[in-house]
């Protein structure tokens, strides 16, 4: 699990202005190994890219990692803003 976190961090760090704000959280569910990438709100456009191309490329790299068992890897990307309920 730590290898995938390191991979996500390594891929995203050169893209952002605020690398210290990169945070990768992990949660395991019955079907997925879920990784939640949070970046500074000013960097979200750089990580997603035009028409989501950068985000798609990051997901392709992360999804290509082999994991043992039937679970699949899932990556979500969020900015660091709090959501109002």
From Swiss-Prot:
Gene inactivation effect: Cell length is reduced.
Cellular compartments annotated: Cytoplasm
GO molecular function: RNA binding
Stretches assigned to the KH domain: 32-85
GO BP term, pick one: peptidoglycan biosynthetic process
GO cellular component, one term: cytoplasm
Main location: cytoplasm
Source organism superkingdom: Bacteria
Record keywords, A-Z: Cell shape, Cell wall biogenesis/degradation, Cytoplasm, RNA-binding
Assembly description: Forms a complex with KhpB.
Chain's role: A probable RNA chaperone. Forms a complex with KhpB which binds to cellular RNA and controls its expression. Plays a role in peptidoglycan (PG) homeostasis and cell length regulation. Necessary for correct cell elongation.
Entry similarity comment: Belongs to the KhpA RNA-binding protein family.
Protein name: RNA-binding protein KhpA
Gene: khpA
């Amino acid at each position: 699990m730590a290898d995938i976190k390191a991979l996500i961090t390594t891929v995203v760090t050169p893209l952002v202005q605020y690398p210290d704000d990169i945070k990768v959280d992990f949660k395991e569910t019955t079907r997925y190994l879920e990784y939640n990438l949070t970046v500074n709100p000013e960097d979200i456009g750089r990580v997603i890219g035009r028409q989501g191309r950068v985000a798609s490329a990051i997901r392709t790299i992360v999804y290509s990692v082999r994991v043992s068992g039937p679970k699949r890897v899932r990556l979500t990307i969020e900015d660091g803003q709090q959501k109002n309920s």
